[in-house]
Amino acid sequence: GIEEIIATGEFSKISGAVDEDAEDGPQNLRGFHTAEKMLFLDGEPRDLETSPFAKNELEYLKLVSERMLSDTQDLYNGWLKGLGTSDVPSSYAEAMKKHDGSAYSIGNVYQAIELMLYGNNGMAGISNEVGSAKITDPVTAWNGSNKDATDPNNPGVLAVESWYSWNSLDDYKNNIVSIKNAYFGGRDLDEESASESSLH
């Protein structure tokens, strides 16, 4: 895990061509929450005067940050122009707009809308993840625990997604706000002010 990598400086698990499966270890050792663990302590930004970074932590944080930047660039480029790979050969945005079957098997407007609304990566998938996993898992674990929030091994505390920074509630709220924004076609819109791009 993260602590082992920091202790040993064995970064081969997280850099270079490693397993990209979201369910497998390497992918889960180099994302946002890994950086969060190193930047926050007990829900507060880490005080470097009292808790300075060790050499391996700095290197780990650098590698994780580079990976997040690369992933963000790939997401942007995949949407805008494609990555030229078998998974993302051309612009996903254009495929959604054209919905003519020429790319990504999006053959009509209904398939494009269905992708946005349903499935693991659609609005329904995100809202279900917030409700059934991000909120339910910690509550269930907490209810079955000693209910001691100061216990560093309390499963209810450890099940909270952003427990290093304690930003989980903001994360959950913003997940739902992102669904609302996508549904109404812009930020801070509603039924009365929905844009032409709205699914409403």
PLM regions and their residue ranges:
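Mature extracytoplasmic or organellar-lumen-exposed domains after removal of signal/transit peptides
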Residues: 1-200
